[in-house]
């Protein structure tokens, strides 16, 4: 329906961005890693996927076309809706997902809140032959995020959005703070925070 959106970034929240297109503000749901690349007042272009429900129209935005295609493929697996597919992309890069699914890595998939062992096994069974090999162009290198407290808010909101309690999210953010460095990488920090929560 809407393959991509190009326009000026009007606002960035902890879970979405508003892009102004022809005088209309489109609210687009994005992962923390994608949101970290956007700056208010600057132009941006996001590949998008529209999810139509009886009572809602939701636009999801992505860092690149590969992430969008992976999002849409994930939803073809039983029990995987758009929110869970986005959660998977928030926790794992597209290549990490490909490696986990083609390598029968249940443990990696169960890092995503909402995916248990049986769910991970079902995803592997249904997508193993369709997801393809790693491309080497995923988010492994990370995306620089704004300095200061902004990355903390993004990681915290990402964890809460994935279903973790506020108190647990706060502890996880505090635990990964020493890893932030001078140029924090929101996607990497979110994955690190999820690892600390899965060990708790």
Curated annotation (Swiss-Prot):
Region (Flexible linker): 142-146
Keywords: Cytoplasm, DNA damage, DNA recombination, DNA repair, DNA-binding
Biological process annotations from GO: DNA recombination; DNA repair
Function per UniProt: The RuvA-RuvB-RuvC complex processes Holliday junction (HJ) DNA during genetic recombination and DNA repair, while the RuvA-RuvB complex plays an important role in the rescue of blocked DNA replication forks via replication fork reversal (RFR). RuvA specifically binds to HJ cruciform DNA, conferring on it an open structure. The RuvB hexamer acts as an ATP-dependent pump, pulling dsDNA into and through the RuvAB complex. HJ branch migration allows RuvC to scan DNA until it finds its consensus sequence, where it cleaves and resolves the cruciform DNA.
SMART domains reported for this sequence: HhH1
Entry comment, domain topic: Has three domains with a flexible linker between the domains II and III and assumes an 'L' shape. Domain III is highly mobile and contacts RuvB.
Protein name: Holliday junction branch migration complex subunit RuvA
Record-linked Pfam families: HHH_5, RuvA_C, RuvA_N
Places the protein is found: Cytoplasm
Classification of source organism: Bacteria, Bacillati, Actinomycetota, Actinomycetes, Propionibacteriales
Keyword DNA-binding: yes
Annotated segments matching region Domain I: 1-63
Assembly behavior: Homotetramer. Forms an RuvA(8)-RuvB(12)-Holliday junction (HJ) complex. HJ DNA is sandwiched between 2 RuvA tetramers; dsDNA enters through RuvA and exits via RuvB. An RuvB hexamer assembles on each DNA strand where it exits the tetramer. Each RuvB hexamer is contacted by two RuvA subunits (via domain III) on 2 adjacent RuvB subunits; this complex drives branch migration. In the full resolvosome a probable DNA-RuvA(4)-RuvB(12)-RuvC(2) complex forms which resolves the HJ.
CDD domains: UBA_RuvA_C (cd14332)
Entry similarity comment: Belongs to the RuvA family.
Region listing for Domain II, in residue ranges: 64-142
GO cellular component, one term: cytoplasm
Gene this protein is translated from: ruvA
Keyword DNA-binding applies: yes
Superkingdom field: Bacteria
Region spans: Domain III: 147-200
